[in-house]
C-alpha cells in the first residue's frame, strides 16, 4: 500500500511475535525511505571514546578495574572470588568461572586479557593458559596462549580450539596472538539466534571478532552451543549471560564493556 507521509514509499506492519530474551518483539513497522529523505530519523548522538578500546558514552562498563559489582560466581550466583588488583581481575585457584549479573543478547563487547609470561615451553596445546569468553551462556570465543615463533612447531593445538576460535566450530582466519604477558583484546559484535514460539530455530547467531584489532571472524554463522568433541546444535533459549571461564589458569582480564545492540526488524513473508 502507499504511504501518506511525504517521502515514505512503503510501510509494512509486522504482526509476528518472536520471543527474544528479556522482551518480546511484536508489531514492528518497517519503513522504506526515499534516497536522501529528510523525514528519515537521524540516529542517536553519542560521545566516542578519546582512545581506541575505551567505552563510548552509551556503553555499559562491566569491569573498570576497581570491583566486580557487575559479576557473580557461576557457582550459585554468589560473590566473585577472583583476585582484583592493579586494574585487572585474575582467575583464582578453584574459584570457578564468573558471569554477568544482567542478561545480555545482541551486543558489541570489548574485553582485554593477558596470559602469564614465563610459561614452561613443554606446556602446549589446551593446557597453555586456557580460558574463554562465553556469550549467552553457550557460545564460546576461546582464550588461549597460541603465540608461536616458528609456525606452530613450538606451540600447537587443534585449529578450532586456539585463541579467538569459535570453540569446536571455526578457527580464526589468522593467528593474531601476542606474546605471553602482553595484553590482548577482543572486540566482538554478536547477533543472537532467534527461536519461534514453538522453539524452532528461525535464525542462527552471527559473530564478528577482532583480535588485537585484526578481523578473525567476519559476520560468521555460529553452528550452535559450544561443545567439546561433539557437533554443535541449537536448543531454544530465552536469555543468557556473558561468562569468563575458569580453566585452572591465572588469566587476567580488564577493561570490559558492552553496547547493547537493537534487534533489526525481521520480516517473515
Language model feature labels by segment:
Residues 13-21:
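Bacterial N-terminal signal peptides
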Residues 24-269:
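Carbohydrate-interacting regions of secretory-pathway proteins
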Residues 7, 21-24:
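Residue-identity detector for glycine
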Residues 2-3, 20, 28:
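N-terminal leader/targeting segments
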Amino acid at each position: 500500500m502507499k504511504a501518506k507521509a511525504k517521502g515514505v514509499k512503503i510501510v509494512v506492519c509486522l504482526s509476528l511475535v518472536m520471543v527474544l530474551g528479556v522482551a518480546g518483539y511484536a508489531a514492528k513497522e518497517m519503513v522504506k525511505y526515499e534516497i536522501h529523505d529528510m523525514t528519515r530519523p537521524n540516529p542517536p548522538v553519542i560521545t566516542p571514546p578519546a582512545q581506541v578500546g575505551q567505552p563510548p558514552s552509551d556503553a555499559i562498563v562491566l569491569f573498570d578495574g576497581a570491583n566486580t559489582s557487575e559479576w557473580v560466581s557461576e557457582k550459585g550466583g554468589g560473590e566473585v572470588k577472583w583476585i582484583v588488583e592493579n586494574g585487572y581481575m585474575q582467575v583464582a585457584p578453584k574459584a570457578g568461572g564468573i558471569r554477568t549479573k544482567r542478561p545480555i543478547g545482541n551486543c558489541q563487547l570489548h574485553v582485554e586479557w593477558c596470559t602469564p609470561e614465563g610459561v614452561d615451553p613443554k606446556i602446549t596445546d589446551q593446557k597453555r593458559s586456557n580460558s574463554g569468553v562465553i556469550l549467552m551462556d553457550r557460545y564460546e570465543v576461546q582464550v588461549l596462549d597460541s603465540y608461536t615463533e616458528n609456525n606452530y612447531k613450538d606451540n600447537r593445538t587443534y585449529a578450532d580450539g586456539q585463541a579467538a576460535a569459535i570453540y569446536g566450530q571455526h578457527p580464526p582466519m589468522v593467528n593474531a596472538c601476542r606474546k605471553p604477558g602482553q595484553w590482548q583484546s577482543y572486540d566482538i559484535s554478536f547477533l543472537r539466534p532467534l527461536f519461534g514460539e514453538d522453539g524452532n530455530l528461525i535464525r542462527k547467531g552471527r559473530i564478528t571478532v577482532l583480535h588485537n584489532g585484526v578481523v578473525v571472524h567476519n559476520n560468521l554463522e555460529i553452528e550452535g552451543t559450544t561443545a567439546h568433541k561433539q557437533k554443535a546444535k541449537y536448543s531454544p533459549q530465552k536469555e543468557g549471560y556473558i561468562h569468563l571461564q575458569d580453566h585452572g589458569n591465572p588469566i587476567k582480564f580488564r577493561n570490559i564493556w558492552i553496547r547493547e545492540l537493537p534487534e533489526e526488524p525481521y520480516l517473515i513473508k
